[in-house]
């Protein structure tokens, strides 16, 4: 069930330029920028940076892009994904 939620709400891609990075994309509806606001204001960006990754916000398209190195532990990745999905759910956003 958890895997289904991940497929629904968060896309995971191998970074074309850098195969050592995993890219997560959270897409919001145009009128809703709640996730990106929350990701900027809470500890997400700090945690992502601590894992050696980066977070960027494409405000016109409503996409929040998170890149994490493959060196991040599976536990850290799972915890971060869990927190992202919980945040999306709590905001009532319908991720695409």
Swiss-Prot record:
For region Disordered, the annotated ranges are: 1-20
Where is carbohydrate linked to this protein?
A: 34
**Keywords for this protein:** Glycoprotein
Against Pfam families, the record matches this protein to:
MIC5
Superkingdom, taxonomy of origin: Eukaryota
**Which InterPro entries does the UniProt entry name for this protein?**
MIC5-like
The name on file for this protein is Antigen H4
User: What is the organism of origin for this protein?
Assistant: Toxoplasma gondii
């Amino acid at each position: 069930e958890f895997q289904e939620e991940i497929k629904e709400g968060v896309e995971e891609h191998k970074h074309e330029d850098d195969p050592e990075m995993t890219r997560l994309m959270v897409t919001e509806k145009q009128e809703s920028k709640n996730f990106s606001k929350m990701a900027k204001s809470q500890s997400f960006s700090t945690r992502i940076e601590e894992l050696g990754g980066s977070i960027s916000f494409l405000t016109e398209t409503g996409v929040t892009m998170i890149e994490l190195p493959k060196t991040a532990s599976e536990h850290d990745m799972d915890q971060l994904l869990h927190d992202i999905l919980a945040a999306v759910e709590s905001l009532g956003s319908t991720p695409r």
